[in-house]
């Protein structure tokens, strides 16, 4: 499994560690592959759940790591990555709210910070050679720490299956709770959980009930709708049901409420950055509610050209986040444009949750451009319907000239 002659040049490496099968095998592999190399395990707490972190340090040390750093990034993740991204309206290929993609830059940044702290000369990740994450992580590393060597075991070692990894660990008496019969590959954080693999690899298969773990099936959700009120300031959710909450706590509260109503499920076949298609089932209950609330307030406050520009920013931002280009001048530019528009995105919105749907049913804003008196068909003092005639003649001038030239 490892080279007979060990590689040199790496003395200390920081590994993005989850405690799963892959990264548990990476620790001994690094020690066997690199001469006199110290392994520092790093885990980012981005809201994947306490159960994922219990015993993690002990497991890393038992696998051969010299130390394990668990860094709490939950609040920063929601405040500085999720909130700015959803303010742009970014949604990949019309359906995906970018849960995995948004988490990668903050994890990579924290990994680099740990590497600087411990004096490491290399970074390591457990991403496969077929997925998007290898590009996302290494793109961030290139922007933040181009001097550090990057090690990607899945592109180097001979192991190709879960069975290979299990056999590798067993041969070294390293304990793992993983089994060869794992069905799905899952990735969770505060924003969402993703599910891939198993029967989902055939797009003709409907996802079984065992796929979903965060939300109830819409058909099993309560028969009575629930209403949740959001207050929004500058494109950020500040209150849930009139309660002031931090970004992370607001998201957690909405996750709890919306998941009971089956809100936030999608089943998509997406275009990966590396060129292939993949099928994924995603659950984003609280995020779906937040997204609906922001768009509802935008309908009130953004004029036609501003709305068009916001949609263009959203499309660019969706691809940028998905493709792992967070630490770039383009990202800074798009976020600045979004922040300018978000100055007016203030107000209150009520979202109706019912059997998988999150619908904005009430909305108001101090910056609203909607006026009931202007929009009615009755007489008003601001809009004289006679003025429309001149506007229409100018608006259709090009069509009129074109028709005249063709005669």
From Swiss-Prot:
Pfam families: Arginosuc_syn_C, Arginosuc_synth. Transmembrane segments: none annotated. Disulfide bonds: none annotated. Its EC number is 6.3.4.5. It catalyses: L-citrulline + L-aspartate + ATP = 2-(N(omega)-L-arginino)succinate + AMP + diphosphate + H(+). Keywords: Amino-acid biosynthesis, Arginine biosynthesis, ATP-binding, Cytoplasm, Ligase, Nucleotide-binding. GO terms for cellular component: cytoplasm. GO terms for molecular function: argininosuccinate synthase activity; ATP binding. InterPro entries: Arginosuc_syn_C (IPR048268), Arginosuc_syn_N (IPR048267), Arginosuc_synth (IPR001518), Arginosuc_synth_CS (IPR018223), Arginosuc_synth_type_1_subfam (IPR023434), AS_cat/multimer_dom_body (IPR024074), Rossmann-like_a/b/a_fold (IPR014729). ATP binds at residues 16-24, 44, 126. L-citrulline binds at residues 96, 101, 132, 136, 185, 194, 270, 282. It is found in: Cytoplasm. Homotetramer. Belongs to the argininosuccinate synthase family. Type 1 subfamily. This is Argininosuccinate synthase. It comes from Shewanella denitrificans (strain OS217 / ATCC BAA-1090 / DSM 15013). The gene is argG.
């Amino acid at each position: 499994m490892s080279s007979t002659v060990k590689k040199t040049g790496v003395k200390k490496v920081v590994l993005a560690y989850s405690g799963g099968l892959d990264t548990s095998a990476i620790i001994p592999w690094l020690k066997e592959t690199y001469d006199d190399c110290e392994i520092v395990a790093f885990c980012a707490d981005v809201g994947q759940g306490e159960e994922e972190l219990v015993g993690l340090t002990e497991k890393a040390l038992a696998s051969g790591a010299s130390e394990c750093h668990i860094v709490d990034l939950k609040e920063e993740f929601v405040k500085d990555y999720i909130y700015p991204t959803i303010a742009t309206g970014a949604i990949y290929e019309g359906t995906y709210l970018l849960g995995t993609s948004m988490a990668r830059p903050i994890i990579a940044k924290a990994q680099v910070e740990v590497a600087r702290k411990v004096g490491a000369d290399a970074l390591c990740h457990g991403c496969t050679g077929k997925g998007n994450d290898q590009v996302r992580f290494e793109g961030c590393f290139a922007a933040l720490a181009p001097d550090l060597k990057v090690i990607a075991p899945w592109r180097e070692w001979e192991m190709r299956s879960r069975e290979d990894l299990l056999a590798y660990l067993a041969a070294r008496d390293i304990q793992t709770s993983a089994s060869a019969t794992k069905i799905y590959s899952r990735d969770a954080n505060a924003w969402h959980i993703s599910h891939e693999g198993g029967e989902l690899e055939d797009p003709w298969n409907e996802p079984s009930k065992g796929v979903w773990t965060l939300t109830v099936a819409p058909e099993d959700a309560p028969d009575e709708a629930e209403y949740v009120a959001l207050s929004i300031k500058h494109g950020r959710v500040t209150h849930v049901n009139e309660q002031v909450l931090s970004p992370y706590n607001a998201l957690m509260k909405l996750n709890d409420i919306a998941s009971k109503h089956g809100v936030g499920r999608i089943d998509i076949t997406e275009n990966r950055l590396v060129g292939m298609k993949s099928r994924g089932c995603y659950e984003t209950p609280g995020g779906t509610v937040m997204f609906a609330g922001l768009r509802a307030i935008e309908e009130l406050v953004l004029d036609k050209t501003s709305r068009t520009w916001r949609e263009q920013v959203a499309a660019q931002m969706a691809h940028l986040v998905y493709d792992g280009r967070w630490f770039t001048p383009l990202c800074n530019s798009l976020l600045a444009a979004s922040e300018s528009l978000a100055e007016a995105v203030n107000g209150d919105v009520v979202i109706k949750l019912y059997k998988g749907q999150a619908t904005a049913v009430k909305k108001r804003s101090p910056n609203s451009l909607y006026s009931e008196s202007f929009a009615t068909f009755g007489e008003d003092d601001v809009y004289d319907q006679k003025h429309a005639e001149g506007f229409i003649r100018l608006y259709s001038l090009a069509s009129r000239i074109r028709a005249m030239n063709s005669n």
